[in-house]
Regions:
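Helix-to-loop junctions at the C-terminal end of transmembrane segments
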Residues: 56-68, 153, 256-269, 351
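C-terminal transmembrane helical hairpin of 12-TM major facilitator-type secondary transporters
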Residues: 270-314
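Helix-loop boundary and gating motifs at the non-cytosolic
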Residues: 2-50, 206-209, 218-235, 242
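Residue-level signature of mid-helix packing/kink "hotspots" within the transmembrane helices
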Residues: 50-58, 142-143, 250-258, 340-341
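Intracellular juxtamembrane helix-capping segments at the cytosolic ends
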Residues: 109-122, 309-322
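Structural signature of the two symmetry-related core transmembrane helices
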Residues: 71-85, 271-285, 364
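A late C-terminal transmembrane helix in Major Facilitator Superfamily
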Residues: 324-353
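Symmetry-related core transmembrane helices of the 12-TM Major Facilitator Superfamily/SLC fold
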Residues: 160-176, 360-375
Length: 386
């Protein structure tokens, strides 16, 4: 298998891995709908995957600190490929849910280890840009993946899972040939650390606020991924159009990461955080009130822009403030995973009890509580920079 260098790994691998997963994560709810699944079962797809992810991601990050990054980075796509391959034969909703849990194992050991590997490839002022390149790579797949998945599903419901399995197996062989463990590089030129350390109350207070914001973002995203397809199918929207609509989230995240990567003005700025969450609130209101596809696309763009800031901030501050990068990326992944655990499941409960638009009212309530908590954390401690 051909080898690629470090720069290409950072540019290509997140795209490749997330393309595989985004193909799976649209096709899985659609096939559960075809199997007669209800909204709670749709939500359980995300909840099962994210529960395993949440529990194991922190452990995976810490294990990568001890065992090295390579073994976990290589194992992740292999486990994901096996789960996709088995899904091609699944005939019951229970089978899909069980395999979604196996997916969570692959994601939980891959992402924290790979993020820590990326963080160790640069230090000082280049860290934020390197994380930005990583973020742009995986979100580029979110533009293509849902659209491709919807198209493949329209050909045959099992084709998306064959495609995701093939992509994951190829990635396994590429990583096995290309990735090696490394020691963290020293900061160039004695770069100043503007964000403090884990002993800094101000920096950590802002980090906790960002973690809460990112939890809320992924609570919302979980509902969009696993509950919106049901609302859309009830409105007679085709699978390919659903994929196009969900791709709007990836497009706006990509653009958000692109602009954030080129500036540090948003670092530790409460106004940027609150502004991003105002975008999410606006998008949720649009989904809750209006039925038009163009309005849905606009709402997804607003929410995607918001998520780009909370995700970028959470990952960057986690590896910048915490001394052990595997620990930082593990916590980052576990916290966003907890949002995906609760979001789709609770959204499914209210959708079944009240109606298909109820999950978006629930998301608005969670977002409001999150903002109140963030204001308390960022006001009670002195932030390094306002």
């Amino acid at each position: 298998m051909a080898r690629i260098n470090e720069r290409m790994i950072i540019a290509v691998v997140p795209f490749w891995m997330d393309l595989s997963s985004s193909i799976f994560y649209l096709a899985a709810p659609l096939i559960v709908i075809d199997l007669g699944g209800n909204p709670v079962e749709l939500g359980l797809i995300g909840t099962m995957t994210a529960s395993v992810h949440m529990i194991l991601a922190n452990l995976g990050g810490r294990l990568s600190d001890r065992l090295g990054r390579r073994i976990l980075i290589v194992a992740g796509p292999f486990i994901f490929a096996i789960s996709c391959l088995l899904t091609t034969q699944a005939g019951k909703v229970f089978h899909i849910l069980a395999l979604a849990s196996l997916n969570g194992v692959g994601m939980a050991i891959f992402w924290p280890s790979f993020q820590a590997w990326v963080a160790e490839s640069r230090a000082g002022s280049n860290l934020a840009r390197n994380i930005g390149s990583f973020n742009m790579s995986w979100t580029a797949s979110q533009i293509i993946g849902p659209t491709l998945s919807g198209f493949l599903f329209s050909l045959h419901p099992r084709v998306p899972f064959w495609a995701a399995a093939a992509l994951s197996f190829l990635l396994f062989f590429l990583l096995r040939a290309s990735v090696s463990d490394k020691s963290p590089q020293p900061a160039k030129g004695g770069a100043i650390l503007p964000l403090g350390t884990e002993d800094s109350d101000g920096g950590m207070g802002f980090l906790y606020a960002i973690w809460i914001a990112n939890f809320a973002s992924w609570f919302i995203l979980g509902n969009l991924r696993y509950q919106f397809p049901k609302l859309a199918r009830d409105m007679a929207i085709s699978p390919s159009t659903i994929g196009l609509l969900l791709s709007c989230i990836g497009l706006s995240q990509f653009l958000g990461f692109f602009f954030l990567r080129g500036s540090d003005r948003w670092h530790f700025k409460k106004s940027y955080l609150l502004g991003a969450q105002l975008l999410s609130a606006s998008g949720l209101l649009l989904i809750f009130v209006f039925p038009q596809k163009l309005i849905f696309a606009s709402a997804f763009i607003l929410i995607g822009l918001s998520v780009s800031l909370t995700y970028y901030s959470s990952l960057y501050y986690s590896v910048r403030l915490l001394k052990r990068k595997g620990k930082g990326t593990g916590l980052h992944e576990s916290i966003l995973g907890s949002g995906v655990v609760l979001g789709p499941f609770l959204g499914g409960v209210v959708a079944l009890s009240i109606g298909p638009r109820a999950p978006y009212a629930l998301c608005l309530a969670v977002l409001a509580v999150a903002v109140v908590m963030e204001l308390g954390l960022t006001s009670s401690r002195r932030s390094p920079r306002r």
